Amino acid sequence: MLRKYQSLIPIYTLLLLVACATAPESDVDTPEYHFKAGMRAIDNADYQQAIKSFQRSVDLDKKFALGYGGLGLAHAYLGQNGQAKDYASKCASRGSKDSEALALSGQIWITMRDSEKKWFKRASSHLKKALKRDEAHEGAMYWYGVAHLYNYQFDEAEDYFRKVVNKRGDYAGKADAKWKLAQKIVRAMPGTPAGKKMALKEKINRADLAVLFAEELKIGVLFDRMPVQNTDFQTPGQATQTANVTVPNDAINHWAETWIKDMIRYGIMDVEPDGNFYPDDTINRALYAMAVQRLLV
């Protein structure tokens, strides 16, 4: 009697799985379409909408690896690393034979690079597996190039971007832009880790600029080497250097306070009329040009 019912267990299991999945409401209510919608939301930085789209994709198909990867990517952008890592693992396990899913898992780890020490190792593991499955996979090559770029391995990054550009596929435009960025950084050759990190930022603020001037251009060393005038007369710049510097209120205990104080002391960057420095304000071209001009005078 028991054997008779044992043969029905797989059927009941299948029926249970089907019952747990959400039924589509239209022929175009598919996991693939919801995934594409989620990725467009990611591009628009609408991460909550992205989560809704990705969640719908896995509700429709519990085995849809890319949906879990999309959820991981959205949570990574939101700084919710625990959830992001869980979904990255689900994506890689459910899509272990799918280069696109493995590449997406790698992308999740790249997105968490500022807060996860082992991001490059984890991303590389997924991307290597993706390329092992398909050595010509465009997305995996592109993201491996991005991983090398953010790991300051510029030659390796350029190699991957070159291959992607030559394929002239969907990633060619993005790869070309990243390739040019890598070339610019190599030509500029930032000499410090801070310089390399700033070179990869799309925007920098006033605090970042203070650090760059101090560490990359060695402003303090340059001013210390300037000949001392044997006269009672001092230029405004020399007077600024010898005077005690009052740290603006909004720079006190700021992570860049030391560098901000130096730039004020040497007259390279100004305190605003209201007494604040505004260290977190984004630098525009005019402010940057003004600071550079003061260095040259």
PLM regions with names:
Residues L2-P10:
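Bacterial N-terminal signal peptides that target proteins for export
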Residues V18-A19:
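C-terminal motif of bacterial Sec signal peptides marking the signal peptidase cleavage site
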Residues A23-D27, N81-Q83, S96, E100, ...:
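N-terminal propeptides
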Residues S26-K63, Y77, D114-S115:
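Alpha-helical segment of the N-proximal tetratricopeptide repeat
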Residues R56-D59, K90-S93, S125-K132, N166:
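Conserved structural position within tetratricopeptide repeats
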